[in-house]
């Protein structure tokens, strides 16, 4: 593979035997080692299996073959590789780099790998692991500033693609790889990284995870699909999870568990496994999801024997105007304190157990909202004539329902009341959850959708069409709830959701704020379920029963 061309204009004199297919090189009897090398370098699938020793699946090999062909023929094409989560996208790219380093080690030239944040370190670690082959072990070198991996005269240089990083000046002779494409800044990529390909019409490969329709990855997908429509050359490789599961039975089991846990249409499952953008599906609670939330059970006026109940409380601030019974509130637009009672039931196929904290159904118990307590502005710990303390009213309500556990939003004004309820009911029966902060609320929203999408959240039916009723208010808030994704667009980290503060609705009393207090109260049960699932909580059901006696002499 020695090159006779000048360093300024590299020429890939590797067409024979590398691109003629298997069995077209010298006879094994004339030069076994040369024949074996040419045989294994003729196809990245063979190289993966026999040199690296970690055979790639067909769904990984197929796009890599197209990329290798573009690199060797200097077609200058761009490719997009999107695989379901944890199905080997980065493994495939690491093996591609090792293959090209081995193929080009005498010819020379450079490849560039760009990523943001942790993606850069992951790419380097994976490459080092895959360079540990009989052909490359002890022969590759690592250099710094920027980090560079060299095998013979070929190299891969790793650069940060963050807009504030100093990454100019490098050349991608053969290949440019950009990882985490969903997080890339399009203007920065076009200004800094795309020109690196110019000198030798290098191939570009974009990797990433599906997030939003407006990010770099999805926009690039549209561009490349248009190019393919014009010339027929495939450029976009979106690997469906079914293709992965067909080749990897273990992945099929894993995928089934994710769908069972979150639901097929949960944004995490839809985006990361089924490659569907999360912002193209309506609001946070589109009609199909709202239908999942509607139960067939009525609202209850009191607890029933032998049923297990929990409570979720979204606590609002107090209003100074509440010092007198019937007096006008100083801030009538403030949120309400809402306590939602949930009944825990199990699927019909479940075996009854005394402790629902132990998984007795696939996915866990079903949470059915059966009642709600609402208060507007009452002082938490100060009574007034004809106006009891909110603390006492809440305690009476929780005791009347004999709740097995209570979760309360303890952020801000909630910590004091949470501590007071814990002292009154028992600390093992009260969870004070800090909902303040975007990360905690993002996770709560994601967990709530997992409950809904797996059929385990149900709100009572019967009054949803009666204006100003509790059920009506809940569904108005569900409809008004919006969402957005910030930062990297990770649904369980970057979700921003809630009813806009400016949202208003026309009621028989006039135009009123919509609020999101009933929705947030109900949502808190998802945090209760997360803790139950993780083993941090165990809900006990107790009942008095008369056990018939038995004659010991009979």
PLM region spans:
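Generic structural signal for hydrophobic core residues of well-folded globular domains
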Residues: 67, 71, 100-101, 343, ...
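Phosphate/NTP-binding elements of NTP-utilizing enzymes
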Residues: 2-313, 318-320, 405
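RNase H-like, metal-dependent nuclease domains and their acidic two-metal-ion catalytic environment used
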Residues: 94-95, 174-177, 205, 213, ...
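Short acidic-glycine loop/turn motifs at beta-strand connectors
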Residues: 151-153, 343-347, 453
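Short, surface-exposed acidic/glycine-rich loop or hinge patches that mediate macromolecular interfaces
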Residues: 118, 183, 244, 384, ...
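Short, surface-exposed basic-aromatic patches at helix termini and helix-loop junctions that form
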Residues: 194-199, 223-227, 399, 419-429, ...
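Acidic, glycine-rich loop-and-strand cores that form catalytic or ligand-binding grooves
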Residues: 452, 456-458
